[in-house]
């Protein structure tokens, strides 16, 4: 996306986007190996078409490495861990590229190049409304406590309150962040304007509902902290020396940020006050590849970071120490991992190689198995979300998940994946020694 691209991007290596009948003469596109955001907005691609389930490409990629060296050897997936999957819906609207997806309380929200956020009702996955503004390009979405937060290409965040009136879904526009009045007053008072508004495009949003906090990350290398109660900016974190691509918040309030400097940083909030309410606790290196996406398991035990080299690095939270230790890297994508999602024991990744991979995680988090490769998009997959179970009456098993993928080809796809045999439970795993939990 040109407006999300860092300035002065250097020439990059090339890669291929699938192009249907023209596969024999593929078109070349750029892949970033630098610390700059690759541009996807001008990608030519084949006209989207409805997809059918394809043959599963099987490969197992795990690593017990102590540091991110990526010396991984692909291993064939045994049939025991293969999955049944299919595309249950494929929708193309005249909105352009799909840039963001969020799911909450039976509704899916999708943002695109246009000025409309489309709302889809589950389980039938039928469109039931739109949220429109004068601004275009919805680059990030998050829904929490019946509020919808959307970041736009103009660097502002719009907020709606969701209500239900006799079964009819309604959204009431609440505010635009930063508020125009506050911005003008700060300007007149001679205050630093950068403390009010991002100076670059917003790339990600995250909510810490328990602390009444909204976070926004930007290509301007900062994370802004907004108090939800009055929608005021209360802090600007100079988080990275390079553009920030992704943020995620744990249930305990720990903030994770990922950037083009090939690191993931961990921040904690200081409730004692001071000039810096958020302090850096640790920096996690991801070799030399910019980190484009983040995902955290529901229990906060595993952190995933998708990189431009196609690897998904992951870190394990120590049971007793609380420290994050490098666990390995998942290999399979041939190009940048643009988005990640985690639900139950599933990890789902979307890539610039136009595929979505589904991984199963063992109970201890150390071993991962790729059980499905979802093929059908004609452009890079930019956004993804996943939730447990199936749509409608398709409740074949309890261990399945539903995945929504949004691509720069403008197509929104819905998939259902069912693992034939779940990974061994922790009760079947061999006992672990104390030395595995403590550094002795």
Regions found by a protein language model. Give the residues of each.
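WD40-repeat beta-propellers
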Residues: 117-121, 157-161, 217, 223-226, ...
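Conserved strand-to-loop turn within each blade of WD40 beta-propeller repeats
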Residues: 111-114, 151-154, 210, 217-220, ...
């Amino acid at each position: 996306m040109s407006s999300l691209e860092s300035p002065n991007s250097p020439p990059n290596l090339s890669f291929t986007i699938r192009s249907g009948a023209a596969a024999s003469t593929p078109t070349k596109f750029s892949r970033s190996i630098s610390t700059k955001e690759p541009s996807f907005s001008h990608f030519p691609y084949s006209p989207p078409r409805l997809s059918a389930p394809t043959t599963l490409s099987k490969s197992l990629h795990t690593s017990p490495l102590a540091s991110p060296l990526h010396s991984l050897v692909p291993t064939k997936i045994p049939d025991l861990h293969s999955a049944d999957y299919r595309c249950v819906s494929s929708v193309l609207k005249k909105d352009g590229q799909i840039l963001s997806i969020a799911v909450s309380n039976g509704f899916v929200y999708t943002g695109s190049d246009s000025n409309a956020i489309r709302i889809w009702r589950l389980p039938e996955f039928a469109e039931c409304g739109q949220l429109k503004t004068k601004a275009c390009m919805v680059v990030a979405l998050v829904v929490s406590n019946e509020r919808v937060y959307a970041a736009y290409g103009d660097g502002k965040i719009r907020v709606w309150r969701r209500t239900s009136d006799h079964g009819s879904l309604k959204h009431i526009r609440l505010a635009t962040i930063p508020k125009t009045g506050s911005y003008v007053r700060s300007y007149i008072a001679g205050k630093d304007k950068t403390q009010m508004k991002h100076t670059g495009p917003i790339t990600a949003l995250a909510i810490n509902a328990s602390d009444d906090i909204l976070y926004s990350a930007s290509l301007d290398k900062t994370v802004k902290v907004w108090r939800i109660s009055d929608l005021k900016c209360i802090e600007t974190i100079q988080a990275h020396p390079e553009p920030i691509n992704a943020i995620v918040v744990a249930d305990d309030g720990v903030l994770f940020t990922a950037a083009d400097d090939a690191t993931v940083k961990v921040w904690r909030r200081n409730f004692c006050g001071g000039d810096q309410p958020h302090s850096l606790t640790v920096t996690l290196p991801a070799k030399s590849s910019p980190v484009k996406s983040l995902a955290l398991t529901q229990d906060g035990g595993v952190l995933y970071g998708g990189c431009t080299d196609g690897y998904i690095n992951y870190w394990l939270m120590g049971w007793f120490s609380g420290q994050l230790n490098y666990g390995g890297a998942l290999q399979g994508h041939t190009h940048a991992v643009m988005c990640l999602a985690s639900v139950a024991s599933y990890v789902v990744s979307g890539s610039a190689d136009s595929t979505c991979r589904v991984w199963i995680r063992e109970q201890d988090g150390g071993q991962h198995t790729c059980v499905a490769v979802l093929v059908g998009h004609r452009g890079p997959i930019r956004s993804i979300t996943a939730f447990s179970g199936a749509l409608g009456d398709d409740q074949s098993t309890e261990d399945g998940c539903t995945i929504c993928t949004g691509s720069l080809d403008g197509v929104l796809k819905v998939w259902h994946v069912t693992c034939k045999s779940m990974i061994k439970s922790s009760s079947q795993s061999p006992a672990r020694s104390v030395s595995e939990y403590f550094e002795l």
